[in-house]
């Protein structure tokens, strides 16, 4: 999948908004994932709850969104930028790579709910970006 210059511009602009709202948006997206796909809770057995208000959900959601925000500044070299995360999720945590796509869908919904200007252009750019991120995070499985 190739990001156009228009896609890259939209994603880079979105990166700052994601960073500024990392905890709230990350918790929301993660809570959506747990509600829609309860099987994903198995990777978080130490969590005391799975709602967006749970401190563990907030902390992990913030970590994920900050990683995504950082990735928006490395669009031309996502593979190298996400290599350590891919290894961690693939070799240590043994996360089913399909879950990256499930989570991406939840992130799109969270962004659409929270961004007033979530235009079709932005939606397309975000979909492409998250698809590339999911692909790179799955690289240790190939």
From Swiss-Prot:
Locate the residues binding heme b.
89
Source domain of life: Eukaryota
Against CDD domains, the record matches this protein to:
Hb-alpha-like
Q: Name one GO molecular function term.
A: peroxidase activity
- Output the Gene Ontology cellular-component terms: blood microparticle; haptoglobin-hemoglobin complex; hemoglobin complex
Q: Where does O2 bind?
A: 60
Q: Which GO terms describe its biological process?
A: hydrogen peroxide catabolic process
Q: Which residues form the Globin domain?
A: 2-142
UniProt-listed InterPro entries: Globin, Globin-like_sf, Globin/Proto, Hemoglobin_a-typ, Hemoglobin_oxygen_transport
Pfam families linked: Globin
Checking PROSITE patterns in the record gives: GLOBIN
Tissues and organs where the protein is expressed, per its UniProt entry: Red blood cells.
* Keyword hit for Iron: yes
Query: Which keywords has UniProt assigned to this entry?
Result: Heme, Iron, Metal-binding, Oxygen transport, Transport
Q: Which family does it belong to?
A: Belongs to the globin family.
- How does this polypeptide assemble, per the annotation? Heterotetramer of two alpha chains and two beta chains.
Function of the protein: Involved in oxygen transport from gills to the various peripheral tissues.
Entry protein name: Hemoglobin subunit alpha
Q: Which organism is it from?
A: Hemitrygon akajei
């Amino acid at each position: 999948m190739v990001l156009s210059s228009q896609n890259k511009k939209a994603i880079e602009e979105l990166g700052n908004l994601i960073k500024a709202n990392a905890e709230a948006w990350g918790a929301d997206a993660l809570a959506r994932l747990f509600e829609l796909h309860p099987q994903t809770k198995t990777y978080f057995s130490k969590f005391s709850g799975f709602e967006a208000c749970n401190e563990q959900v907030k902390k992990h959601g913030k970590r994920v969104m900050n990683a995504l925000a950082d990735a928006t500044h490395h669009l031309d070299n996502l593979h190298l930028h996400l290599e350590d995360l891919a290894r961690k999720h693939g070799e240590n945590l043994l996360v089913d790579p399909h879950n990256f796509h499930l989570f991406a869908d939840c992130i799109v919904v969270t962004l659409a709910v929270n961004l007033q200007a979530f235009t079709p252009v932005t939606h397309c750019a975000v979909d492409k970006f998250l698809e590339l991120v999911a692909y790179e995070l799955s690289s240790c499985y190939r």
